[in-house]
A protein has these predicted regions:
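Short alpha-helical segments that sit at the start of domains
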Residues: 1-12
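Alpha-helical hairpin
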Residues: 2-3, 38, 67, 85
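Residue-level marker of regulatory loop/turn positions in helix-turn-helix DNA-binding domains and
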Residues: 3, 23, 144
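Conserved RecA-like P-loop NTPase ATPase core
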Residues: 10, 68, 213
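Contiguous, well-ordered alpha-helical segments that form the cores/surfaces of helical PPI scaffolds
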Residues: 11-16, 195-199
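N-terminal helix-turn-helix
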Residues: 13-16, 20, 24-78
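Intrinsically disordered, acidic Ser/Thr/Pro-rich low-complexity regulatory segments
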Residues: 73, 80-241
């Protein structure tokens, strides 16, 4: 569906506010913080239109709005801009991963540790032998989505139910370099507030695996995506050295 420029800017503002706060977003908050040049009344009208078009939804207990998976997809594809990683972070990540390049197991442990630390999420990797590596399990407890013990138990239980994790990763399709799954796209009820970002990583010309992060569906994709891509590239580079 076509959106006006004002609707696109409003959707971007609502999603970024939701990423920051984890709370439904109201017109007053947008008017005060994002300087869109329109009144709260006009913002409310446009929010209703975005809801009708399927980009936003309204929780029953709130007058505010939250993005749908469709809205988040549009934001990631067209509205947001990936951030440039700090040079110091790139150097630190590269040094830590490259220092373990002689042993695949240690290299992947270092890679998921770097992702977990930089993204403050759960980092994970699967090698060509379906060996699972992960780090940062305590990080997800910093996110309100994981205050629900059932959600946290289900996510951590995926590491004991490997076929289920493989099934989730296998749901990604298309030719995107980085695959993203979140929200209503998840078939399991306890995963609908979570997000998975992962990418194929080539260890050698003949072998490959998967690396990525698990966190809230509203994760800051502006920084998460470049970190996942960068770590993937360094792991692949280590395999060629």
């Amino acid at each position: 569906m076509d959106l006006s420029e004002r609707q696109r800017q409003l959707l971007k503002a609502i999603i970024e506010e939701y990423i920051d706060t984890a709370e439904p977003v109201g017109s007053e908050a947008i008017e005060k913080k994002y300087n869109l040049g329109v009144s709260p009344a006009t913002i409310r009208i446009e929010m209703s239109k975005l809801t009708e078009k399927g980009y936003l939804k309204q929780p029953h207990t709130s007058a505010g709005r939250t993005p749908t998976s469709v809205g988040m997809r549009l934001y990631i594809a067209e509205l947001m801009k990936e951030k440039q990683l700090p040079v110091a972070a790139e150097v630190s990540i590269k040094e830590s991963i490259m220092s373990q390049r002689s042993r695949r197991e240690r290299l992947l442990k270092e890679a998921v540790k770097a992702l977990a630390s930089r993204c403050n999420m759960l980092g994970m990797a699967i090698d060509e032998d379906n060996q699972l590596y992960y780090a940062g399990t305590s990080n997800i407890l910093d996110w309100p989505e994981f205050y629900d013990i059932d959600v946290t138990k289900f996510v951590l239980g995926l590491f004991d139910e490997f076929p289920t994790l493989q099934n989730i990763i296998g749901r990604a399709h298309g030719t995107e370099a980085v695959h993203i799954l979140f929200g209503d796209e998840m078939e399991f009820e306890f995963l609908k507030t979570t997000g998975f970002v992962f990418t194929r990583v080539d260890f050698t010309p003949e072998t490959s695996g998967v690396i990525g992060v698990i966190g809230p569906a509203r994760m800051n994709f502006q920084t998460v995506l470049p970190y996942v891509k960068y770590v993937r590239d360094i792991v692949s580079e280590a395999g060629r050295v």
